[in-house]
Amino acid sequence: MRAESPGDVQQTIRVARDRGMRLSVLGGGHDWAGRAVCDGGLVIDMSGMRSVTVDSGARVATVGGGVIAADLIDAVAPYGLVAATGNCGGVGITGLTLGGGYGPLNGRFGLASDNLLGAEVVLADGRIVKADATHEPELFWALRGGGGNFGVVTSMRVQLHPLDRLIGGMILFPWSQGATVWRGLDEVLSTAPDEWTVLSGLMSGPDGNPAVFLAPAWSGDLLSGQAAVDALTKLGTPLSGQVAPMTYREWLSLFDAWDVRGQCWAINTRTIAGYTPEVIDALLEIGRTLTPPRSGISIHHCHGASTLVAPDQTAFANRRPHFVVEIIAGWEGGDSVRHRAWADAASAALAPHALPGGYANLLVPGDHEQIANAYGENAIRLVAAKKHYDPDGVFTAIPLPGVSEGKRSNAVHRR
């Protein structure tokens, strides 16, 4: 069903329930596990709901349920504003926000979910409600990190922030220097200000061999930022390094190659406290067995403003400084076995050094151990909200601890 209005979504939910059909929701189309589609069921396609309305004075944008990061950033850029998004322009804003939302501006402006001001939601019983600090406050709390478990978000109001340009780019180092680079990066990030976020990881380099990448994003004073960025290039001998003032949209385009749509992917995830010697050793072994050319690892840094929110203020509970390791296996056609095996082995190598739980938007379906610990002490409250707003389990693609995944439904917004 190609939805063009909340009424279309409402009607589709009612049809699915009346006929006992599985239901899924396609938002931005960036979910690696394909949870936005379901064979033999109904798919609510939100891709036609991509409107963005900007109130530049209030610094607020109202976005449709199918809006992707590129849509939002393009709409707000003429006003010298940005929004907290993921690391790729193709990521859906709604699904990203509902699961938490890591990105290059988290240190300064918080997670995407921290910037959610309100939402219009079609509930499992077909009612259309508004959720914000004064209307359905418990639903509003659950939407900020609890995933697509409570209804279909047809529009959201998100906070915007002034930012014309940042300093960013991509620096590649040879794999032989991986240990030195990550040790140095750990020291740099230990005193990093909120304006300073560095995405790191591994990918296939220009020669086809594994390489370490650093993707800095400095959103503060450009003059001060240049010195910080220059220090990164001295952590090793770069294979390449193009770092300069750029727009936020240009920074997001650095990761267009990892847009999951139309490709074959498997993703695992682990959460770590930092680049300890044990973690670095595990990363080096993971890189040694990397399956090129699309596979890699992306390590997201949660710090600054993202850690200043009380754990119980929103459903997203992990508020201590940490890193999310996104293990990405990519391939073409039927060549899946060795790539999936690499991702599984990478996850296993990091497991002894990982924190409990994981990032809901990236968790492997059926990984009950990480799911059980993903929400911390917020899990009990989330399950109660689930029973109140969706007692029959219509929306269950990102399961909550102790909640059955259900037989009829498999709905969640894609990232």
Regions found by a protein language model. Give the residues of each.
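Soluble FAD-dependent oxygen oxidases
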Residues: 1-415
